[in-house]
Amino acid sequence: WTEHALINTVSPNPRFAERCATQVIELIRQNFNHPSIVFWGIGNDCQTQRVAAAKPLLEMLAREVRLEDPDRLSTIATNYGELFGAYGLDSVAHNKYQGWYSATPDEFAPWLDTQRAKSPGQSIGMSEFGAGAGVNTHRAPGVRMDHSEEYQAYYHEVYWRALRDRPWVWCKAIWQMFDAASAGRNEGELPGINDKGLVTRDRLTRKDAFYWYKANWNDEPMVYVTSRRFTPRSVAQTEIKIYSNC
């Protein structure tokens, strides 16, 4: 999956649409020889329910993808709930953060089933899901948006169980592998950082959630004691959680 840099804001200015089309064409022509690319993404979280110009723009970009590379699939990452076939695309994937920005992680599985019921027989993609955490932030139990390792791990436990049990979810993309710079953010342990990574930005520290996925995805025998950086603790007795594939 490689994606055109159209995110959030859509302008009704015709020059905006022209520039988007040019960028999609350039993206494909510059990268079409990469065998790893299966999907061309035409945007991310575009304001399809707020801006009238968004729908015709995305339909036009989907046509450009089909003209430039009819042998690969077109897609979009969205948090607006579009269904399979939107804008003439070959696929649609969703960015969902239930349990982080709002609601609880337990609402994710019912949401998947509702989307499936709206578009029976069609696959659903998950292009983003995640929760933030700092390796020096701890709470037992963690709570939504506290940026604790404990809550991030719990969030991913709930999400992965839901995704594992639904094979019709065609892609499952964690946001994100590494913490990354994000100038507009002021949250968690450091300003200017999106801390939803499973690993710190310097690639040196793997968070607890990393080992949750390792226990589920890797056949190499492993055991990992979580919350190992949670010292000192404020209670005399504490619960110990272990990830293992043994």
PLM feature spans:
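Extended substrate-binding grooves/exosites of carbohydrate-active enzymes
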Residues: 1-246
